[in-house]
Amino acid sequence: MTVITKTKESALHFSHNKPDDTPWRSDGLRDFFLYRDLGIAKATNGKVIAHLVKANKPPTEGTGWHHHVCEFQIVLRTKGWAKFMYEDKVTLVEAGDCIHQRPGMTHYLFDYSPDMEYLEIVSPADFGTVEVEGPCEIPPSTPWTEK
């Protein structure tokens, strides 16, 4: 159960989110991912969002070139791996890796493992995403194989 208690000093709230408190949802930014809200946007009055994201479908199209309109963003890979283009550089992000993605940085997620999962923290909670022209070609993704 999520417990939220308002504090007078900061107008922020305490939040405790357990794995069964919030479901995995498919109505997030990308339809090939599943998202699990961790209650942080509500607890911070929209200052920050924290959610878990995991692979739902194979990386056939990727995210397209884009950047986020935000003040702060980090991604902590908790399982699997993903390959990004950060501007014109291929970057492999594996379980345990943490990325600070500066505001406005052009990127493209083009490949990931079936078990890929990450924690994403962004400020503000209602950050925007802007599609842009990319600086280079994208390498091919790795097809998933049936187990």
Residue ranges and their predicted role:
Residues 87-105:
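Short acidic-glycine-tyrosine-enriched beta hairpin
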Residues 52-56, 67-86, 121-124:
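Short, conserved beta-strand element in jelly-roll/cupin
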Residues 1-57, 131-147:
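A short, N-terminal "cap"/entry segment at the start of jelly-roll beta-barrel domains
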Residues 30, 43-48, 58-74, 87-88, ...:
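A short beta-loop-beta micro-motif enriched in histidine and acidic residues
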Residues 88, 111-112:
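Conserved catalytic-core motifs of eukaryotic protein kinase domains, centered on the activation segment
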Residues 48-52, 100, 113-131:
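A short hydrophobic beta-strand segment most commonly corresponding to one strand
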